[in-house]
């Protein structure tokens, strides 16, 4: 029976499969099998025993139901796996889990789950990057009003908006490469990290296990891999979520009825409200913003998991059972929703232009001030004069440039040609070059495989 929305509502089947019980059990069995193979290579156990253990360390032989049955009796999840695997291996079962402590298996298996999950996240980030890159190129010259403090500021372009997000997604992709080096690690170090239970060949055993599984050995551990590693992982997931939250929030705001410059896609048969038939609510981007709040909240317990008693206690375990699958599945949902939204983003060019001129050239106050300073008026004096003229234009509902034309002090410095040149479309500075620089950088990273 599904209870949590990640079981049935959020995330892809691909990501949910990573964290479902059967796959988690399989990863534990994979680690046990790799340990047996390492022992056999070093002559610690018979090769035939390693072969049998490896062959039967899968969920076709070791049933989840049997593991749960044993755990209900002995109240120890990993020992339940060990007993269930030993049962199906017959006389070879005595070599299962040789030298290991529970978290040798758990933490190494977690690294395998995280590796699978991060591969999905990376794929989605790269697909999102491609979508944003095309949007930045397509709208490099789409001039719109920039807003600061929710108020009209000066012109920018939609190319700038998309390139800003593109650059941030690229940083996440680069962060992910660095993160893998620290997160995709396992351990075979025993109860307190000294590896005493593995004897003289402890390092060789660990090296063989990690090479077999495609992981790196942690440099030092106590009973567990230190949870600063997981905290960094959780912060990365939350940081990606914050970028998606930022993008979704901007689209939601730009879809407001009074603005309506862009809109998330709306299906032909889609219903916006149960009582208001006309509604086109931004439910996809609202969902992204909502799920981000859960991702943010999961960072705190990850930080609290780092300080544990002595060589470890168990307070981290129950937390990680919740926050790891939940965070990966929810981020997976957010990434896939944002890909869909951006692919189908609707633009309303007439509204973009209307909003650009909505303030009757008040947004030209900055270039007007700079033009006066260029013509010989002191910069501070020009600022105060334009401020007064802008406030007058605002109060009287008049065009700023018309007010300027009737001001003797301003017109001592300005010509009609100066005023004619003050058009929003002309005041975007180096926007095109900035967007091109971002796109060029991203394309270079793509060529490098980053």
From Swiss-Prot:
Family annotation (CDD domains): Adenylsuccinate_lyase_1 (cd01360)
Binding residues annotated for N(6)-(1,2-dicarboxyethyl)-AMP, in chain numbering: 9-10, 75-77, 101-102, 223, 274, 279-281, 318-322
A single Gene Ontology CC term: cytosol
Active site, UniProt feature: 149, 273
Pathway involvement of the protein, from the record: Purine metabolism; AMP biosynthesis via de novo pathway; AMP from IMP: step 2/2; Purine metabolism; IMP biosynthesis via de novo pathway; 5-amino-1-(5-phospho-D-ribosyl)imidazole-4-carboxamide from 5-amino-1-(5-phospho-D-ribosyl)imidazole-4-carboxylate: step 2/2
UniProt key word Lyase: yes
Protein purpose: Catalyzes two reactions in de novo purine nucleotide biosynthesis. Catalyzes the breakdown of 5-aminoimidazole- (N-succinylocarboxamide) ribotide (SAICAR or 2-[5-amino-1-(5-phospho-beta-D-ribosyl)imidazole-4-carboxamido]succinate) to 5-aminoimidazole-4-carboxamide ribotide (AICAR or 5-amino-1-(5-phospho-beta-D-ribosyl)imidazole-4-carboxamide) and fumarate, and of adenylosuccinate (ADS or N(6)-(1,2-dicarboxyethyl)-AMP) to adenosine monophosphate (AMP) and fumarate.
Subunit composition and interactions: Homotetramer. Residues from neighboring subunits contribute catalytic and substrate-binding residues to each active site.
UniProt family annotation: Belongs to the lyase 1 family. Adenylosuccinate lyase subfamily.
Cross-referenced PANTHER family: ADENYLOSUCCINATE LYASE
Protein name: Adenylosuccinate lyase
Native species: Pyrococcus abyssi (strain GE5 / Orsay)
Gene name of this polypeptide: purB
């Amino acid at each position: 029976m599904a209870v949590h929305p990640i079981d049935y509502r959020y995330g892809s089947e691909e990501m949910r499969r990573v964290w479902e019980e059967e796959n988690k059990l399989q990863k534990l069995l994979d680690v046990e099998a790799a340990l047996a193979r390492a022992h056999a290579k070093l002559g610690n156990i018979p090769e035939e025993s390693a072969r049998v253990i490896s062959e039967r360390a899968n969920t076709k032989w070791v049933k989840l139901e049997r593991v749960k049955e044993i755990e209900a009796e002995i109240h120890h999840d990993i020992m339940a796996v060990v007993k269930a695997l030993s049962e199906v291996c017959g006389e070879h079962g005595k070599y299962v889990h040789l030298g290991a402590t529970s978290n040798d298996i758990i933490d190494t298996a977690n690294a395998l789950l995280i590796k699978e999950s991060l591969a999905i996240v990376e794929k989605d980030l790269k697909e999102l990057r491609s979508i944003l890159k095309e949007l930045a190129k397509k709208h490099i010259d789409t001039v719109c009003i920039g807003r600061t403090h929710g108020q009209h500021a000066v012109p920018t372009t939609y190319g700038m908006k998309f390139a800003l997000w593109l650059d941030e997604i690229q940083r996440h992709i680069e962060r992910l490469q660095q993160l893998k080096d620290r997160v995709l690690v396992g351990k075979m170090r025993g109860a307190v990290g000294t590896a005493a239970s593995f004897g003289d060949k402890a390092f060789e055993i660990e090296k063989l296990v990690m090479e077999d599984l495609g992981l790196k050995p942690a440099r030092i551990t106590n009973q567990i891999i230190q949870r600063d590693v997981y905290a960094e992982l959780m912060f990365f997931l939350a940081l990606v979520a914050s970028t998606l939250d930022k993008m979704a929030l901007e689209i939601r705001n730009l879809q407001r009825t009074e603005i309506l410059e862009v809109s998330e896609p709306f299906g032909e048969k889609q219903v916006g409200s149960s009582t208001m038939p006309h509604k086109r609510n931004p439910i996809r981007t609202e969902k992204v913003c909502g799920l981000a709040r859960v991702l943010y909240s999961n960072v705190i317990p990850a930080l609290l998991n780092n300080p544990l008693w002595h060589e470890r206690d168990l307070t981290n375990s129950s937390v990680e059972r919740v926050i790891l699958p939940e965070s990966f599945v929810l981020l997976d949902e957010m990434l896939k929703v944002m890909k869909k939204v951006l692919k189908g983003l609707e633009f309303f060019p007439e509204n973009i232009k209307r909003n650009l001129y909505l303030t009757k050239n008040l947004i030209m106050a900055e270039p007007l001030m700079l033009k006066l300073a260029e013509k010989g008026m002191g910069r501070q004096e020009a600022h105060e004069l334009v401020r007064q003229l802008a406030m007058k234009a605002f109060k009287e509902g008049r065009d700023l440039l018309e007010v300027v034309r009737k001001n003797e002090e301003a017109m001592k410095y300005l010509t009609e040609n100066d005023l004619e040149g003050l058009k929003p479309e002309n005041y975007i500075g180096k926007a095109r070059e900035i967007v091109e620089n971002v796109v060029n950088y991203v394309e270079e990273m793509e060529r490098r495989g980053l």
